[in-house]
Amino acid sequence: MAALSVVCLLLAAASWRPVSASGEEFWPGQSAADILSGAASRRRYLLYDVNPPEGFNLRRDVYIRVASLLKTLLKTEEWVLVLPPWGRLYHWQSPDIHQVRIPWSEFFDLPSLNKNIPVIEYEQFIAESGGPFIDQVYVLQGYAEGWKEGTWEEKVDARPCIDPLLYSQDKHEYYRGWFWGYEETRGLNVSCLSVQGSASIVAPVLLKNTSARSVMLDRAENLLHDHYGGREYWDTRRSMVFAKHLRAVGDEFRSQHLNSTDAADKMAPEEDWTKMKVKLGSALGGPYLGVHLRRKDFIWGHREDVPSLEGAVKKIRSLMKTHQLDKVFVATDAIRKEQEELRKLLPEMVRFEPTWEELELYKDGGVAIIDQWICAHARFFIGTSVSTFSFRIHEEREILGLDPKTTYNRFCGDQEKACEQPTHWKIAY
């Protein structure tokens, strides 16, 4: 019996799961029905949203910041992060496709997210909490007086709202707002917090200044990372595994059009990200050049570090020759006219071009993920300066174990004199 107890203890130690402050284990994949008794009746809910103009890939970065806040809260109380439904993003411009109220499971693998922090979809929150009501909404903002030069000071204070609120009270004095496209959702109270610092700076406010069971942080992009580039950052980033159906589409495309498979490319992916720890440079990548060519608002802003199409193609051909690659995969947001021009300049380029039915199924966000997945598996990758789309590909390649020299590269502007290449943020386990 004693021996059996020792075995059980060893197994328990080997399979760590997040434990709440109350001592109860959190099990990934729990449904509302499973946990309605016990923890679910006591736990508190953290919700958040981001400035509407911000894109898909910046929002993924904000998730990492909020996840670190949740980990801080979990040291004291039972909390769960409610995933903000996707929708109404500036870059998602495909017509006639319904792209609001999109759950995270359309784009990411929820069991993987749950191995890092407890998360639930918004509709599960409604079911668990008793309705579409959020007890407290905090709108995060800077300080009206700005940051005074000198010593950096992390601080948070309840302050009058600087900008007009994007919430209005109805006749019942509930607050109506965007709320991710859920018109029936109401906020019971809305106030503003001025913040200057990392995400966990608001933890004392949530733990001590409010007893609200559900708290939403609007404009969460105003919070900084707790530990950018550290182990906690990478744990959360690694947990953001793309949805299995999108990875499968990307893998099929690699195989059919780019002669690329995990076995041939020396990739050793694990379905469980917590078990995946690879040496940088151990993966070879597929026999093609991966390219992210950002256009649209990047060129409208007359950025000096974005090349002309001719300049980009010249660099692409140079890289293909240097690395002896005869295939090139291009992910771009170029308008149709530029795409046609690019095709004339680079007739051999390969692109993932979904049918209307596929676009309706995967949506613009899913197509972006498929593009990133294919770029992440290339033998060599070159991206666009300061693009979060390219940054996310850098991270994905780092996770997959590709040589950093084949990852942290960007196009230079035609007249750019000092073309500084992206910084290597080394993965931490």
UniProtKB/Swiss-Prot annotation:
Disulfide bonds: 161-192, 412-419
EC number(s) reported in the record: 2.4.1.221
Signal peptide: 1-21
Source species, domain of life: Eukaryota
Subcellular location field: Endoplasmic reticulum; Golgi apparatus
GO cellular component terms, A-Z: endoplasmic reticulum membrane; Golgi apparatus
Phenotype on disruption: Null mice embryos die before 10.5 dpc. At the onset of gastrulation at 6.5 dpc, embryos are rounder and the embryonic and extra-embryonic ectoderm appears thickened and disorganized. Expression of NODAL and WNT3 is significantly expanded and/or displaced in the primitive streak as is BMP4 in the extra-embryonic ectoderm. By 7.5 dpc, embryos are unusually dense and shorter characterized by a dumb-bell appearance. There is unrestricted epithelial to mesenchymal transition (EMT) producing an abundance of mesenchymal cells. SNAIL1 expression is expanded and E-cadherin expression decreased.
Keywords: Carbohydrate metabolism, Disulfide bond, Endoplasmic reticulum, Fucose metabolism, Glycoprotein, Glycosyltransferase, Golgi apparatus, Signal, Transferase
GO terms classed as biological process: fucose metabolic process; fucosylation; mesoderm formation; positive regulation of protein folding; protein O-linked fucosylation; regulation of epithelial to mesenchymal transition; regulation of gene expression; regulation of secretion
Site entry: Required for enzyme activity: 396
Keyword match Iron: no
Binding-site list for GDP-beta-L-fucose: 53-57, 292-294, 371, 388-389
Catalytic activities: L-seryl-[protein] + GDP-beta-L-fucose = 3-O-(alpha-L-fucosyl)-L-seryl-[protein] + GDP + H(+); L-threonyl-[protein] + GDP-beta-L-fucose = 3-O-(alpha-L-fucosyl)-L-threonyl-[protein] + GDP + H(+)
Pfam families documented for this protein: O-FucT (PF10250)
Gene3D superfamilies in the record: 3.40.50.11340, 3.40.50.11350
Entry keyword Transmembrane helix: no
InterPro entries, per database record: GDP-Fuc_O-FucTrfase, OFUT2-like
GO MF term set: fucosyltransferase activity; peptide-O-fucosyltransferase activity
Glycosylation sites: 189, 209, 259
Pathway annotation from the record: Protein modification; protein glycosylation
Active site, UniProt feature: 54
Function of the molecule: Catalyzes the reaction that attaches fucose through an O-glycosidic linkage to a conserved serine or threonine residue in the consensus sequence C1-X-X-S/T-C2 of thrombospondin type I repeats (TSRs) where C1 and C2 are the first and second cysteines of the repeat, respectively. O-fucosylates members of several protein families including the ADAMTS, the thrombospondin (TSP) and spondin families. Required for the proper secretion of ADAMTS family members such as ADAMTSL1 and ADAMTS13.
Annotated family: Belongs to the glycosyltransferase 68 family.
PANTHER family linked to this entry: GDP-FUCOSE PROTEIN O-FUCOSYLTRANSFERASE 2 (PTHR13398:SF0)
Protein name: GDP-fucose protein O-fucosyltransferase 2
Organism: Mus musculus (Mouse)
Gene designation: Pofut2
